[in-house]
């Protein structure tokens, strides 16, 4: 089976649509940005992914669906630093520091998420910014954004 486009996301399905038999493809965060790859579901089904559009995969993306079955993307958990700034000043300080290091980050209402790095952990300790190291799933890829200093 070759998948060339995403058919939706389980987050947008009704409860009755979610009752289909589900197979999952477990991906590493770094694989979410790959348009072309060969994967195997948790039921042993081999799938080729060759996306026509240059989009990143996300947790819950539907790779295949029929009347009774669907194959969705799941994301393996990974080692993260969950940064919990108490003030806007702390948030600005750590965001500036992480930006200078060109580290990709993700944000929730109250947290900044970065992939574990012992140097960032040392920085957080030295700045006194609260954080926890946690194994957690993220819904989308950590992506570097290229730019120039010219």
Swiss-Prot record:
GO biological process terms, semicolon-separated: protein folding; protein-containing complex assembly; urea metabolic process
Keywords, sorted A to Z: Chaperone, Cytoplasm, Nickel, Nickel insertion
Molecular-function GO terms, alphabetical: nickel cation binding; unfolded protein binding
Cellular component aspect of the GO annotation: cytoplasm
Subcellular locations according to the entry: Cytoplasm
Keyword Chaperone among record annotations: yes
Superkingdom as given in the UniProt entry: Bacteria
InterPro entries found in the cross-reference section: UreE, UreE_C_dom, UreE_N, UreE_N_sf
SUPFAM superfamilies: Urease metallochaperone UreE, C-terminal domain (SSF69737), Urease metallochaperone UreE, N-terminal domain (SSF69287)
Pfam families for this protein: UreE_C, UreE_N
UniProt xrefs under CDD domains: UreE
Family per similarity comment: Belongs to the UreE family.
Function: Involved in urease metallocenter assembly. Binds nickel. Probably functions as a nickel donor during metallocenter assembly.
Name of the protein in question: Urease accessory protein UreE
